[in-house]
Amino acid sequence: MQTAVDETNKYQRQNATSNIGKTAAWYDTTMEELYVFFDTTILMGLNQKNRIKDYWSTDKLITTPIFGELFTRDRYLSILRYLHFADNNTEEESKLRKIKPVMEYLRAKFERAVTLWENLCVDESLMLWKGRLGFKQCIPSKRHRFGVKLFMLCDCDTKFILNFIVYTAEQKQKSTIIQS
């Protein structure tokens, strides 16, 4: 998580073109603040609204006061704008270079959480994605037809993901599903 804090603060300094407007109020984020940011984002998934700004609305019909208690709207949007997990100055050419630290962190946590059992399966999954992305896939037979294709190694008994590969349609997949 400290890497995300450092890279977010660095990315903001690299891209703050002027001290005018909402970026003038930027102050470096902390690990505690990023934890609250991710908690808020998960809470938004549980209480869905049409626009991000609606979570901080004072309209009596759609108000949700918890979001205002966790963050101001402008601070949340600032962190969302500058959130970064990897250094932009790296020479790596992979399409996943910006989220590679997160993927490696998740793989390590998955590996520590569960030991391998006998009943394993490799599953293809499509994670919904509506934005622009160079490796977005279209699979007409899936419920969400457009998204990011994943191959996951799962334990059939516990339903736990042991490892995963994000399909990017690159010539060589550098990561392997079963690590030695």
Give names to the regions the model predicted.
Residues 1-179:
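N-terminal initiation segments
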